[in-house]
Amino acid sequence: MPDGIVASEAKDNTNNNLVHSFLGPKFPAASESSIMWFILRCLEWTLAKLLYRRRGYDHDLFYKGLAFGKYPNPTFTVTSPDCGPTGAKLGVEYSQWGSGKVPQLTWPVSGIEVKEYLIISEDPDAPLGHSNVHGIYCFVPGNKTGFGPDDLELLGEDKNGLKQISSGYLVGKNRRNTVYIAPRPPLGHGPHRYFFEIVALSQPLDPEKLSPVPTKQELSDMIIGKVCGWGLWTATFEQKWSM
């Protein structure tokens, strides 16, 4: 075998051993594409460490808005049959490294008359300078006591970005213009917290006054005087080198 080919194979084996020793046996055999992927991961980790203190934008969470003046704390308990009580650690299947499904959530039948619910998911630890919206869902019937993946199947989308989903809920705006953004915190940025806020409304939202894809701020203003309670479920997820 020519010396050049032998040297090239030896270099590939060295790279392969280096990558495997750092990332573990799950990492694929070294190649130009895998080495480039590894370099990009290192750059992501470095940037995340530089931005590590950019987190904790809890003041920007939806329930910190003026509409919650009478109810600064949750009034009912939300839990997840799949993941457990609030504060759970999300499995990989709930992230962008897995199927990216939303956790199944449940809450008790309300003791007061709820016209409808508004559901918002957000991450206050994203290094964006504000809480990052992952999902907004309007017009959830007041007799509902659960929410999950089956509600969010995308059936279609028009030219204005209006999405039709299996539940019939109106989908609000997130930064990717999708039905839901599954967790994918930057590698090296540590655990991120994900807040799922279930807001009970004493009056229904007026669809004539909502934009086709309502924003968090738009809804925050619209529900002033309509909040009659709310529940909160949180979870954490951290991206690992081995993912």
From Swiss-Prot:
Phomoidrides A and B (also known as CP-225,917 and CP-263,114) are potent inhibitors of Ras farnesyltransferase and squalene synthase. CP-225,917 and CP-263,114 inhibit Ras farnesyl transferase from rat brain with IC(50) values of 6 uM and 20 uoM, respectively. CP-225,917 inhibits squalene synthase with an IC(50) value of 43 uM and CP-263,114 with an IC(50) of 160 uM. SUPFAM superfamilies: PEBP-like. InterPro entries: PEBP, PEBP-like_sf, PhiB. It holds the Pfam family PBP. Belongs to the tstB family. Phosphatidylethanolamine-binding protein; part of the gene cluster that mediates the biosynthesis of the antihypercholesterolemic agents phomoidrides which are dimeric anhydrides. Within the pathway, tstB is not essential for dimerization and its function has still to be determined. The pathway begins with the highly reducing polyketide synthase tstA that catalyzes the formation of a C12-fatty acyl-ACP, starting from one acetate and 5 malonate units. The hydrolase tstM is involved in the release of the C12-fatty acyl chain from phiA. This is Phomoidride biosynthesis cluster protein B. The gene is tstB.
